[in-house]
Every structure is written in structure tokens, then in C-alpha cells.
Amino acid sequence: VFTDSFRATVIAARMVNVLLGCGMAWFTWKIGELLFRKKETGRLFAVLVCFLPGTCFLFSYINTDGLALFTTAWILYCWCRACKEGWTLKVCIQMGIAMGLCMLSYYNAYGYLLMSAVFFAGCMMKCGEQKWDWQQLLKKGCLMLGIVFLVAGWWFIRSGILYDGDFLGMKTSSIYAEKYAIDELKPSNRVLPVNMGMSVLDMIWWVPGEWQHNWLVTVLVSFVGTFGHLDIFMPYLWSKVYLIVFAVGILGNSWRLR
């Protein structure tokens, strides 16, 4: 607003992601308080999540991954509150806002929207009577859907108007990628498992291009942190330490819940 410096503009844009990272850290902290009895355990949970190398990296530059992580943390926080307090008005309003913002991030974050619907519907079943509480289901469900529409609906309406009904923008994105992208990234030239006749199992063990690992190992180590175009890997020791810590935690909690 007050300068034409390109550097200042870039830093200002990055600050949005920094603030989203702070928001995600706060929600993760609150989730830890709700999930664990001991404060120390909840804080360790927040530290392990927020200081993952991949997490720190994603909140340091301009992208929509930050919004996706922030909103999914908010959604998980609402799930935890719903388990503890029930679907109160405050929880429903927060859930609606969180889901609406999530819709404005990446499509691959939409799984949380689907599971939120399943989780909410499950909560509306009276377990003792094995009956649906239809009144609460419709009342609170419509409230959340209305908030989602207010937060995110305008974007999809705009896209539908601008792109001849392509409200998701996927077809338009492919058209412009074919027109303007470099040759190896044009949709018609991209090498995909589906074009190679691979099965799901083949895809899991496939090592594409110059990658060092197959898809399964890449997913595991990128959970901790992989950079560039998923081709810059951290020292293996760091990835192994993180994965061992998470594995021990999962096994320990599973043992206690038996």
C-alpha cells in the first residue's frame, strides 16, 4: 500500500503464511490440551507437529498449503471440542467457518470436509437407541452448510461465471497449462501412471524419473520434510529419528487403549 518495492510486496505476502502458521500452531496446542491428560504430553504433541521441517518450510513462502494446514488443524480442533462439549452453537459456527476456508485452499484438503460430514452424521445418531436425531442433524447441518456457502460460495460462483460453468476451474487450468506451460509440464506430455497402464500396486513401488525412492517411501519421508519438486531429501538420519518417534508414540498409545 505504501511502497512499490517488489521485495516489500513479497515479504508482505509471505507474512500471510507466517500468520497462518501461527494459527495452526495455536490450534495444534489446543488440540493437545483436549487429547491428552498431561500438559507436558500435549505440548510435546504440538512441538512435534509444528516443528516438522516440512511444516516450517511450507509456512515460509507464498502458497495455499498454509491455508490448507491451518484450516485442517481448525477442523480437527472442532472435532475434539464436539467430542467433549457436543455440537454447540459455537462449535457449529467455528466448524462452518473452518470448512469454508478449507474449500478456498487445495482440493486435496477436501478429504477433511468429507470426513467432517461423516463424523457429524455419526454424532447425530443416538447410540443407545440406534436412531438418528433428525431434528438436530438438519438444524445444525444446515447452519454449518449456510456458513460454508457464505465463506466460500462466492468464489465458485465467480469461477462459474468467468470460466463458462467450470466452477472448479480444473478444465480451464488444463487448457491454459497446455497453452502456456513448458513442454514437459503440458497435460498432453506428462507421464502419469494411468497413462502407462499401471495398477495401484505398481504405482506404489514405481520410482519416477530421477527420484531416489518409490512413491511409498517418498510419502513417508515427505511427511517429515522433502523439498524442491520432492527431489531434495534431508539426511536420512533425521527422517528416521522423526519416524521412529512417531511410531513409538502410536504403538504406545495403541497399547494403552487395548
Report residues per predicted region:
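Hydrophobic, aromatic-rich transmembrane alpha-helices
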Residues: 213-258
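Membrane-interface alpha helices of multi-pass inner-membrane proteins
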Residues: 91-107, 150
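Specific aromatic-rich, kink-prone transmembrane helix
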Residues: 27-30, 67-85, 97-99, 115
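Short acidic/glycine- and proline-prone juxtamembrane loop motifs at membrane-interface regions
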Residues: 54-68
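Transmembrane-helix motifs of polytopic, lipid-linked glycan transferases
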Residues: 11-36, 74
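Membrane-interface transmembrane helices that cradle and orient dolichyl/undecaprenyl
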Residues: 33-36, 75-91, 102, 124-127
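Perimembrane helix-loop-helix junctions
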Residues: 78-84, 112-148
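Transmembrane-helix signature of polytopic, membrane-embedded enzymes
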Residues: 4-7, 28-51, 70
